[in-house]
């Protein structure tokens, strides 16, 4: 085997999946296929989703392959949300924030992928990759919110209407050249990259904000804004691999990249039919990140194990021009970035892997902008051009084993990330009007540990299988609250237990339970520690009868509880469907079903952060009926492939009404 760029070049080989495709024809506006869902499987809002795409792949010559695709999707979301938030302050009583909003979001997305892989001769090849996306979005929202002190005294109230329209274009291109020398294992590769991103947007804010207390007043805002973001990135990587004999390899590499950003945000105050620029909210900002990184790696392979160690030296330069503030930024950051990997194969079915790597975590262009964002006048955000990159240590361990004779499997996966000079949020709350301002800052460090385990055991006498998968995560970080340092410790434990019973191809029963308990502790006031639990219980059954008929039922019970606020919400969801398999080899399936039979049109999300606990409820698609037809091409071409009850490969056509 050739070891081309063994520190990561093989990742492009992992993206391949099964063949086939899918055509989705939708006749109504309630189907949510392909729409991202939130935790617990309950979507937010009512969504209408249209999607379609086409693949075109062709061998242009014996040595040249063309792979291309186009995909389009349109998502229209109508959402109603209610938010209840308890905010905690150091050495002060807590206060409550409540918000209700009605909004609509419309997104149109186009994506084009084009890859040309040209094998020049037995020693040389070149690969061109291009990804293009274009999107248009439009958001509208009407929001009412209020803040009350701990004794329920009204402190402020806001009514606002926001609009935002945006178009964006992104291009990412790369050219990879690979050369194999006559000496086995000696290789040379170079990869050139180009990235272009253009975003144009405009928005409006109309709000009435009432403040009570010692300085009662009413503030009315009528503003419009325009914003353009332009980014160009150029880079290249050169990698040389030299075999040292005895299945040992030495790699030398060098990477260079520059990111140029231009940001312009202009806010106008509208009053009496006249528009004037607001210099406090407007911002023109240019920046250039320049990365330079030489590195060296050593790898050794043995029959049972292999390992690699290496180090890179990264120099990062940030040059910025704050045009509206007449200020300039010129800073440089330097770090050594070591890496180590170890793999041990006990057998073909038992593996152990350790990985350690370091990285620089640069702030985003949004975090660096010194602009004040007041789209929510009670919750203001501002950037920080003085941010420095964080330095992260990432350690992971992965163990997998499978007994093919007993069909017992087990895996354990753990990660730990320790970041120094980490980027965190600094929040300040004005004690007179309870307006909150957030700003990214550098803090000393933070730590995050995650664990994921799974054990699968068959029970042959009962035609059953049991899976148990505990999970945990620990986060220990620093945030600033009213200029006081607050270390927050967050622990989440939970997991999933699943039982499956199968009787021939007639009956399949699946029972599962998922639990997640999160506890958050604060240094500044332990009496304000928070805890909440989310539970999901699922029962599903598939019954095949009269050879070609199948009855599907599923019942999900979602339970959300807060130990801090006594919040409790339970949501039962019942789905029933009847299928009839048609045509030769049962390649067609006609299905009639009713989803959410109990008409539960609510979803819940609980969140705990550095200084607040929040519950958000959203409207959800209620009871609806669906008729679908699926035609599986792979079963027509291969009658032995694709059984009932599983995922069908090949081409599928679904019609929903």
List where the protein language model places each region.
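Extracytoplasmic loops and strand-loop junctions of Gram-negative outer membrane beta-barrel proteins
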Residues: 34-40, 93-100, 153-161, 172, ...
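Feature captures outer-membrane beta-barrel proteins of Gram-negative bacteria and organelles
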Residues: 336-342, 395, 412, 493-501, ...
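Outer-membrane beta-barrel translocator domains and adjoining extracellular loop/strand segments
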Residues: 3-6, 79-95, 139-154, 200-211, ...
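Signature of Gram-negative outer-membrane beta-barrel scaffolds
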Residues: 250-352, 523-525
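C-terminal beta-barrel architecture of Gram-negative outer-membrane proteins
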Residues: 509-579, 607
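Membrane-proximal, glycine/serine-rich, low-complexity loop/turn segments characteristic
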Residues: 1-142, 162-201, 239-262, 297-299, ...
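Outer membrane beta-barrel strand-and-loop segments of large Gram-negative receptors
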Residues: 100, 233-235, 267, 276-286, ...
């Amino acid at each position: 085997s050739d070891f081309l760029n063994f520190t990561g070049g093989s990742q492009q080989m992992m993206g391949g999946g099964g063949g086939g495709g899918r055509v989705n024809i939708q006749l109504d506006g309630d189907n949510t296929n392909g729409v991202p869902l939130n935790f617990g499987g309950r979507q937010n809002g009512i969504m209408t989703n249209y999607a379609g795409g086409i693949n075109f792949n062709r061998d242009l010559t014996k040595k040249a392959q063309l792979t291309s695709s186009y995909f389009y999707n349109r998502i229209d979301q109508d959402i109603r949300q209610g938010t209840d938030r308890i905010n905690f302050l150091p050495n002060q009583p807590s206060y409550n924030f409540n918000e209700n909003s009605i909004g609509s979001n419309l997104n149109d997305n186009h994506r084009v992928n084009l890859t040309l892989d040209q094998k020049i001769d037995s020693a040389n090849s070149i690969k061109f990759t291009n990804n293009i996306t274009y999107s248009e979005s439009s958001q509208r929202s009407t929001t009412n919110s209020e803040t009350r002190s701990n004794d329920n005294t009204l402190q402020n109230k806001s009514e606002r209407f926001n609009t935002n329209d945006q178009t964006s274009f992104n291009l990412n291109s790369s050219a990879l050249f690979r050369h194999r020398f006559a000496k086995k294992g000696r290789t040379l590769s170079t990869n050139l990259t180009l990235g272009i991103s253009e975003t144009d947007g405009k928005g409006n804010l109309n709000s009435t904000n009432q403040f009570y207390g010692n300085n009662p007043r009413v503030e009315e805002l009528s503003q419009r804004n325009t914003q353009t973001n332009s980014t160009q990135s150029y880079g290249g990587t050169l990698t040389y691999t030299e075999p040292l004999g005895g299945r040992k390899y030495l790699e030398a590499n060098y990477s260079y990249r520059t990111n140029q950003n231009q940001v312009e945000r202009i806010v106008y105050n509208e009053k009496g039919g006249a528009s004037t620029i607001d210099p406090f909210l407007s911002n023109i900002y240019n920046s250039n990140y320049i990365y330079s990184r030489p590195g060296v790696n050593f790898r050794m392979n043995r029959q049972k194990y292999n390992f690699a160690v290496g180090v890179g030296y990264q120099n990062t330069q940030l040059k910025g021009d704050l045009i509206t503030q007449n200020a300039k930024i010129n800073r440089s950051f330097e770090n050594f970035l070591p890496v180590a990997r170890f793999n041990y194969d006990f057998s073909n079915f038992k593996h152990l892997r350790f990985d350690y790597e370091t990285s620089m975590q640069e702030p985003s262009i949004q975090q660096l902008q010194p602009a004040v964002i007041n789209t929510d006048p009670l919750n203001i955000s501002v950037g920080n051009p003085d941010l420095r990159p964080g330095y992260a240590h990432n350690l992971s361990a992965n163990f997998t084993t499978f007994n093919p004779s007993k069909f017992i499997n087990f895996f354990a996966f753990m990660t730990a990330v320790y970041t120094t000079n980490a980027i965190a949020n600094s929040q300040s709350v004005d004690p007179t009007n309870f307006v909150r301002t957030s700003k990214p800052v550098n803090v000393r460090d933070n730590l995050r540990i995650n664990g994921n385990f799974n054990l699968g055991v068959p029970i042959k006498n009962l035609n059953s299988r049991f899976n148990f998968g505990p999970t945990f995560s620990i986060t220990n970080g620093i945030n600033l609250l009213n200029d006081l340092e607050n270390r927050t410790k967050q622990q989440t434990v939970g997991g999933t237990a699943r039982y499956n019973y199968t009787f021939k191809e007639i009956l399949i029963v699946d029972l599962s339970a998922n639990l997640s308990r999160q506890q958050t502790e604060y240094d500044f006031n332990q009496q304000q520690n928070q805890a909440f639990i989310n539970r999901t219980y699922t029962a599903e059954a598939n019954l095949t009868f009269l050879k070609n008929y199948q009855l599907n039922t599923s019942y999900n019970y979602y339970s959300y509880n807060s130990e801090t606020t006594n919040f409790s919400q339970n949501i039962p969801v019942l789905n029933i469907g009847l299928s009839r398999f048609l045509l030769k080899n049962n390649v067609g399936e006609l299905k009639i079903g009713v989803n959410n039979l109990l008409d539960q049109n609510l979803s819940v999300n609980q969140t705990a952060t550095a200084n607040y606990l929040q519950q958000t409820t959203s409207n959800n698609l209620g009871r609806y009926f669906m008729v679908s037809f699926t035609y599986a091409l792979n079963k027509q071409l291969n009658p032995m492939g694709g059984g009932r009850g599983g995922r069908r490969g090949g081409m599928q056509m679904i019609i929903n009404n």
